[in-house]
Amino acid sequence: MTLNQLLKQNQSFYGASVIAGEDCLDREVKSVMVLEAADIENWGKPGQLLLTSFYALQILDAENSRKFFINMQKIGICGIVLKLGRLISDIPPYIMDYCNYYHIPLITVPKTTQYETMILSIMEPLMRQMLRKQSTMQRYNDLVGD
């Protein structure tokens, strides 16, 4: 599923707004992770969608934020979902600038949006897709034989 499909078809993203990186909404979402630490180079994966309330990013100055976004681009992170109103009510302009410059979609959701709901709504279709592939492979193996 792409970010665009996720935003249009998923009720858990009701009230979401794309505020930067609009040109990259065709990226495929392969997994989802809550951003708790800025050492993304140690755990980030291509196609990962990051959920955050800005907690891990608030300690970064502009230069370290730039490095964080460079690492996100290198890894292939598909986007960031930021819960506004929990820790911050306004996004620092340099964050939006980096998202646009490094082509990383920045999506805001209301503070009432629950991480659990977003994570489940992303992982359920991904798991169904994986199970379908596994079932297809099993049928093929059954037909071909061992």
Label each PLM-derived region with a short phrase:
Residues 1-146:
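Alpha-helical/coil-rich non-catalytic "connector" segments in signaling and regulatory proteins
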